[in-house]
Amino acid sequence: MTQRKIIDVSTYNDTIDWKKVKKYGCDGAIIKIIRKDLGKDKKFEENYKKCEKLGIPWGVYNYTYATTVAKAKSDMELVCDILDKISKKHFKYGVWFDIEDKVQAGLSKVKIAEIINAAQTVVESRGYKFGVYTGMSYFSEHIDKNKVKCKNWWIARYYKGYNRMAFKATPNKSYKPTNVADLMVWQYTSSGVFPAKVSTGNGGKFDLNILYHDFPATVQKEETTKKVKYTGKFPKLPPRGYYAFLDGITVLKNTREEIEKLQKFLNWAIGSKLETDGKYGEKTEDAVSIFQSKCKLKIDGKFGAKSLKAAKLFSK
């Protein structure tokens, strides 16, 4: 495909004249969707609606403050909930997980990988394409590519000494990140300007990016002509009503047999490839979370009455 030049925007850009943005040759935008307090970005509604009206391709990003897998999951569920309810005719650039905040800097590479992978699991299970945004130094210091599943990277690496850079200017390729094999987008400046001022915020400056590859915004699902239900046995819930990760240490035979049934069901339902060992460990908990996401249940990794009901109704 031809390389595309796109911008990313948020409330900091304030009111944007999207007609002018399109007129000056911008190929699309990635729009901030939620804030730290989990409310929508104050300009999200206005920005995406203008893109839809004018036929400007767009996607969304979430600047994450997550330091746990659970937080990453719940935040990305919210992102997908918002997207599910709005018009997406020109939604072409998917969902991006922006991880660069200092709150994650003290976490291990393993924990950061778990957070990213959890976010990806939620987004893709909801039918959207997923990518990760971060800065070049953050990528080098905090990301272990061998532990992160994502193959779509959006990396920021800026020129030094540029206070303003014209939208039409061609960036110096020597600054392009070279150690990211799966580079999808390069953010090359935070000081981009159009031929005339097109926004009332951030001094009229924008982040400018080059999109190198096609990035379908939604996951293509296979069409099936006949739904199939599970023919195996379902587990019986324990007295407290759910299975949870903390019970992975249990050795009671009857409990392990029930968890084996659950693992067999998850292998059938979502292809989780779990070892049917009867232990409710981290992998089983993650598989339950994926199943809950597919069924649009609360994601907590606990297999309880609502999850069991969904399992009995589940078909593929």
Q: What are the functions of these language-model segments?
A:
Residues 288:
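Conserved hydrophobic/aromatic packing and binding residues within compact polymer-binding modules
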Residues 10-12, 223-278:
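Acidic, Ser/Thr/Pro/Gly-enriched interdomain connector segments
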